C-alpha cells in the first residue's frame, strides 16, 4: 500500500529540552536530506543517528542544530521509511523545522495517522493500535501494563484463536453440505456443533469476565467523597492525593464546588471527586454546589461517605446513607482523635454490610486501611495485570457482548432443530463481529473515526 509522505511534531508543544519532528513515507529520507547539512542521509545505514544542522534553503541560514535518526522500511513503526529530527524544545524552532519539511512537498499528518499507517501496512492490528492511546493515557503502572500487553497482541491472539475455531467449524459444515458423499470427513452432527459453539461462547464469557476490572484500570473508578460540611471530606482528598488540593478549614461550607483529582491507589486509578458538603443552606452558591454534589454521587462508581466521630448522627447523615443504598460505598468515620459522640452500632447498621473504617486524617491514621478496602472491593485485593488479559476498551466489550449473544442464538437454533446450513448465518456473523475487534472485518469509516481520537504526531 502506497501513501504520500507525512510529518508532524511528535512531542508535546511547549518549552523543553528536546522536541521531535517525525517524518514517514517512501521519500522521507530524501525530503529531509534536502534541508539537512551534514552527512548525506540517503547513503547512511538504517537505524543510525547523525549530527548536523537544518538549513533554510531560501536564505541558506542555519535554523537548528539537530540529531537525525534514520529508520528504513520495513523495520519501522509504520513499515515506511521514517526520519525523526531531534531539535531543541520550544515553540518557534521546532515549528520552523516542521515548516521547512512541509515546504519540500511533505503533508502535515492528521491525528493518529502514523499509527493508522502501522495498522494499514499490517504491522499491528486495530486492538493493538487502540492500545497505543491507552498507553499514552495510562494513569498507573497497572494500567500501563494492561496497555502494553494489548500492544504485544495478547487480546489479538485470543480473538484470533476464537475466529480460527469458528472458521474451521464453518469449513466442516460446508464440506458436509456440499459433499455429503465424502466418507473421510466426520459428519457435523448437532451435538458436535453445539459442543464447538458452546466452547466459543464460554471463551468469550471468560474474556468478558475481566471487563469490569479492565475498564477500571483504563478509565479509573469515579469516586465521590460525600458528607455533611466540615466532616473531613477535603482532608480525605488531600490525604489520598498526598498534597493540598482542597481548602481545609473549620468553617462549614468551605468547598462550594466539585474538585476532581486522579490518584493511584495500589495500582488502581481513582478519579476522586470532593463534593460540597450536603446540607440545607440559604447560600445560593453553596446550594448549587450541593446540587452538583448529589449529581456526582449518583454518577459515581464508588462513594466514600464521611461522618464525624465526635458528633452524633444527624438526619442529614442518615439521608446520605439512604441515598447510597444500591451503590458500592465505604463509610469513613473521621476525627477519631476527638472524644466519641457517634453511635458506631448505628453507623454499622446504616452501612448495611459495607466496610466501615475509622480515621484520624489530622494524625494520618486509617488511610492504608481505606486504600486496602478499595482494592479489596474492586479487585478482591489483587490485581494481576501481568498474567491476565484484561479487556478494557468499551468498543471491544460491546463487540464481545454482541458476539456472545450471536453465538448464543446459534446454540439456541441448533437445540431447536434448525438445519445446520441455517446456523451458518449466526456462526459467520460471530466470526465477523470478532474480526471487528482486530480490524479484519471493520468498515473504513470506523477506522477513520478511531484514529481521529489520537494525538497529532502519533
From Swiss-Prot:
Binding site for (6S)-5-formyl-5,6,7,8-tetrahydrofolate: 22, 84, 123, 458
Keyword annotations: Cytoplasm, GTP-binding, Hydrolase, Magnesium, Metal-binding, Nucleotide-binding, Potassium, tRNA processing
Annotated compartments: Cytoplasm
Keyword Cytoplasm in annotation: yes
Subunit structure: Homodimer. Heterotetramer of two MnmE and two MnmG subunits.
Function, in words: Exhibits a very high intrinsic GTPase hydrolysis rate. Involved in the addition of a carboxymethylaminomethyl (cmnm) group at the wobble position (U34) of certain tRNAs, forming tRNA-cmnm(5)s(2)U34.
The protein's name in its UniProt record: tRNA modification GTPase MnmE
Organism: Bacillus anthracis
Amino acid at each position: 500500500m502506497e501513501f504520500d509522505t507525512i510529518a508532524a511534531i511528535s512531542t508535546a508543544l511547549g518549552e523543553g529540552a528536546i522536541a521531535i519532528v517525525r517524518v514517514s513515507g517512501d521519500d522521507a529520507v530524501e525530503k529531509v536530506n534536502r534541508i539537512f547539512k551534514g552527512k548525506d542521509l540517503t547513503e547512511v545505514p538504517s537505524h543510525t543517528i547523525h549530527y548536523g544542522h537544518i538549513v533554510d534553503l531560501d536564505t541558506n541560514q542555519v535554523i537548528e542544530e539537530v540529531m537525525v535518526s534514520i529508520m528504513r522500511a520495513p523495520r519501522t513503526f509504520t513499515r515506511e521509511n521514517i526520519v525523526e529530527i531531534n531539535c531543541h524544545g520550544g515553540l518557534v524552532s521546532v515549528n520552523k523545522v516542521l515548516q521547512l519539511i512541509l515546504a519540500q512537498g511533505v503533508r502535515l499528518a492528521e491525528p493518529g495517522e502514523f499509527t493508522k499507517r502501522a495498522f494499514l501496512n499490517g504491522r499491528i492490528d486495530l486492538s493493538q493500535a487502540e492500545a497505543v492511546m491507552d498507553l499514552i493515557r495510562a494513569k498507573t503502572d497497572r494500567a500501563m501494563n494492561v496497555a502494553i500487553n494489548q500492544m504485544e497482541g495478547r487480546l489479538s491472539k485470543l480473538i484470533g484463536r476464537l475466529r480460527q475455531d469458528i472458521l474451521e467449524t464453518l469449513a466442516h459444515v460446508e464440506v458436509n453440505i456440499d459433499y455429503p458423499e465424502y466418507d473421510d470427513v466426520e459428519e457435523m452432527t448437532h451435538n458436535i456443533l453445539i459442543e464447538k459453539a458452546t466452547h466459543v461462547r464460554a471463551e468469550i464469557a471468560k474474556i468478558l469476565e475481566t471487563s469490569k476490572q479492565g475498564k477500571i484500570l483504563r478509565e479509573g473508578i469515579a469516586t465521590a467523597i460525600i458528607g455533611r460540611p466540615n466532616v473531613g471530606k477535603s482532608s480525605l482528598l488531600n490525604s489520598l492525593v498526598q498534597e493540598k488540593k482542597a481548602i481545609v478549614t473549620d468553617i462549614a461550607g468551605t468547598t462550594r464546588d466539585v474538585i476532581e483529582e486522579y490518584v493511584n491507589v495500589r495500582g488502581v486509578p481513582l478519579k476522586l471527586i470532593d463534593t460540597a458538603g450536603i446540607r440545607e443552606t440559604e447560600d445560593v452558591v453553596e446550594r448549587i454546589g450541593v446540587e452538583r454534589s448529589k449529581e456526582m454521587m449518583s454518577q459515581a462508581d464508588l462513594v466514600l461517605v464521611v461522618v464525624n466521630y465526635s458528633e452524633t448522627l444527624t438526619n442529614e447523615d442518615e439521608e446520605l446513607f439512604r441515598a447510597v443504598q444500591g451503590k458500592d460505598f465505604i463509610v469513613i468515620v473521621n476525627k477519631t482523635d476527638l472524644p466519641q459522640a457517634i453511635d458506631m452500632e448505628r453507623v454499622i447498621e446504616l452501612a448495611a454490610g459495607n466496610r466501615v473504617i475509622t480515621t484520624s486524617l489530622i494524625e494520618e491514621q486509617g488511610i492504608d486501611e481505606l486504600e486496602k478496602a478499595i482494592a479489596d472491593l474492586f479487585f478482591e485485593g489483587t490485581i494481576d495485570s501481568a498474567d491476565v488479559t484484561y479487556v478494557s476498551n468499551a468498543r471491544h466489550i460491546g463487540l464481545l457482548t454482541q458476539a456472545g449473544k450471536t453465538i448464543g442464538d446459534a446454540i439456541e437454533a441448533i437445540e431447536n432443530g434448525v438445519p445446520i446450513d441455517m446456523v451458518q448465518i449466526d456462526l459467520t456473523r460471530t466470526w465477523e463481529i470478532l474480526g471487528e475487534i482486530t480490524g479484519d472485518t471493520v468498515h473504513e469509516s470506523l477506522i477513520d473515526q478511531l484514529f481521529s481520537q489520537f494525538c497529532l504526531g502519533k
